[in-house]
Curated annotation (Swiss-Prot):
GO terms for molecular function: NADH dehydrogenase (ubiquinone) activity; NADH:ubiquinone reductase (non-electrogenic) activity; quinone binding. This is NADH-quinone oxidoreductase subunit C. Pfam families: Complex1_30kDa. It comes from Chromobacterium violaceum (strain ATCC 12472 / DSM 30191 / JCM 1249 / CCUG 213 / NBRC 12614 / NCIMB 9131 / NCTC 9757 / MK). Belongs to the complex I 30 kDa subunit family. One of its GO terms (cellular component) is plasma membrane. It is a peripheral membrane protein. It is found in: Cell inner membrane. Its EC number is 7.1.1.-. NDH-1 shuttles electrons from NADH, via FMN and iron-sulfur (Fe-S) centers, to quinones in the respiratory chain. The immediate electron acceptor for the enzyme in this species is believed to be ubiquinone. Couples the redox reaction to proton translocation (for every two electrons transferred, four hydrogen ions are translocated across the cytoplasmic membrane), and thus conserves the redox energy in a proton gradient. InterPro entries: NADH_DH_suC, NADH_quin_OxRdtase_su_C/D-like, NADH_UbQ_OxRdtase_30kDa_su, NADH_UbQ_OxRdtase_CS. NDH-1 is composed of 14 different subunits. Subunits NuoB, C, D, E, F, and G constitute the peripheral sector of the complex. Keywords: Cell inner membrane, Cell membrane, Membrane, NAD, Quinone, Translocase, Transport, Ubiquinone.
């Protein structure tokens, strides 16, 4: 059961955002709202500047790949950015989810101009998921190497990667080469004893 405080926050958010609010979910005493990518900047501005919301702090931004979400097939957009916002003044939190409209080239506007703290979070989501944050002042890889191929947190990225690096003593430097790990299927051998389990 949701607290009255969170229900009241949900009502204020719904009134402030109007038709820009696609969906609102209250679960486990946390409010999650969804808006379109085209409305993100105005929604973020409202969440920050509205006197009854005052979400002045962006505490996290994470990318999501919904292509293999839960056990059933996902039929919505594949990539999303999820913003975790905090109002220090009013002591409440909200989660804002924005889906990229194109699965092949996911683009979401950058909120770096609204919350400066989103800068490196958006770079991380770009690096690991390939979500392009349009208008970001310095969108480049943050965690992987400069020549890294692909985005490692995507569900279709191979566990072994595409290349491996090693030190080559003849060239006296680190080199990249195609992965030499052979994929194999491991089938456990099960031995049942006569009196097993009782």
């Amino acid at each position: 059961m949701a607290s009255k405080k969170m229900e009241a926050l949900g009502s204020v958010v719904a009134e402030a955002l109007g038709d820009k609010l696609v969906r609102s979910t209250l679960a486990l005493d946390e409010l999650t709202i969804v808006c379109k990518a085209s409305d993100l900047l105005s929604v973020a501005q409202t969440l920050r500047d509205h006197a009854d919301l005052a979400f002045e702090q962006c505490i996290d931004v994470c990318g999501m790949d919904y292509s293999a979400y839960r056990d059933e097939p996902w039929d919505g957009p594949r990539f999303a950015a999820v913003y975790h916002l905090l109002s220090v003044k009013l002591n409440h939190r909200i989660r804002l989810r924005v889906f990229a409209e194109d699965d092949d080239f996911p683009v979401i506007p950058s909120v770096n101009g609204i919350w400066n703290a989103a800068n490196w979070f958006e770079r991380e989501a770009f690096d690991l998921y390939g979500i392009v944050f349009e208008g970001h002042p310095d969108l480049r890889r943050l965690l992987t190497d400069y020549g890294f191929v692909g985005h490692p947190f995507r569900k279709d990225f191979p566990l072994s990667g595409y290349v491996e690096m090693r030190y080559d003593p003849t060239q006296q430097r680190v080199i990249y080469q195609p992965v030499t790990i052979e994929p194999r299927e491991i089938t456990p051998r099960i031995i049942r004893e006569e009196n097993y389990g009782g």
